[in-house]
Amino acid sequence: MQKKNLIVFDIDDTLTKSENQHQAAYVNTMIDFGITEINQDWKSYPNVTDSHILKLNYEANFNKEFNLSFIPDFERRMTERMLALNKTEEIKGASKIVDFFMNETDYAICFATGSLLAPVLIKLEQANINFVPELVETSNTIFTREEIVKSAIEKAKTYFQVTKFKSIISVGDGIWDLKTAKNLGIHFL
């Protein structure tokens, strides 16, 4: 079926019950790397993404500029920590909803999250959420949610060979998801 519309899904606590595991692995990984003074008031950050929060805390702790080349080592350690925690479960019905829209409607699906890629793939796999890796956008190289969502939309256009989607709906659970959709002029659920 030709895809004419798009749903952009957030992942943590939208499709997967993973926010607690994510935060534990994330904060403990920062500590592993010597980032011990951590502002955990996530809503206070201008960009609620792993890369942006890591950047600001890194710079505050080490008094030097953050470089994205730090992300791969951080991501590896965070992934190890995620795998040591309880398995991620789906939000009830999430996998059925994703499958329904992908297989039975003219809605394409993509994923946009402020998390880092490797932990996200683990969460989706553990929760048995069907996904195409090329349709997952994360914060590995992008600091803002708006840019993450825009990149996910572009990936979906390429993957589904669509020049422009008639309607785009962002689905998320955080106030930052709502703000992002509003800033981009797309629908929000």
What are these regions (language model features)?
Residues 144, 169-187:
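Acidic, divalent-metal-coordinating active-site segment for phosphoryl/phosphodiester hydrolysis
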Residues 2-9, 15-93:
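N-terminal helical cap/lid subdomain that shapes the substrate entry/recognition surface
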Residues 105-110, 166-168, 185-188:
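Short active-site oxyanion
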